[in-house]
Curated annotation (Swiss-Prot):
Domain of life, per lineage: Eukaryota
Keyword Transit peptide among record annotations: no
Taxonomic lineage of the native organism: Eukaryota, Metazoa, Ecdysozoa, Arthropoda, Crustacea
Signal peptide: 1-22
GO molecular function, one term: hormone activity
Annotated localization: Secreted
Modified residues (Alanine amide): 75
Key word Signal present: yes
Function: The pigment-dispersing hormone causes the migration of the distal retinal pigment into the proximal end of the pigment chromatophore cells and thus decreases the amount of light entering the retinulas. May also function as a neurotransmitter and/or neuromodulator.
Protein's UniProt name: Pigment-dispersing hormone 1 peptides
Tissue: Eyestalk sinus gland.
A single Gene Ontology CC term: extracellular region
């Protein structure tokens, strides 16, 4: 997980270096770099939070699994 964060940081640094060669960053580019930096920071602080996603109770998981055949059957009729 740490290696992927390091790779992501290197990619952002490389993109920033390419974009700033001989020119200033435009507003959209600055916004994009800031957004990427925020996402990398969030992953570095709590890597499990990004991977887990929203928490579901066991009953919600069971109900969604039990409802799959009905959803697939309804989709097949369309």
């Amino acid at each position: 997980m740490r290696s992927s964060v390091i790779v992501a940081v290197l990619v952002v640094v490389a993109l920033a270096a390419l974009l700033t060669q001989g020119q200033e960053l435009k507003y959209q580019e600055r916004e994009m770099v800031a957004e990427l930096a925020q996402q990398i920071y969030r992953v570095a602080q709590a890597p499990w939070a990004a991977a887990v996603g929203p928490h579901k109770r066991n009953s919600e998981l069971i109900n969604s699994i039990l409802g799959l055949p009905k959803v697939m059957n309804d989709a097949g009729r369309r």
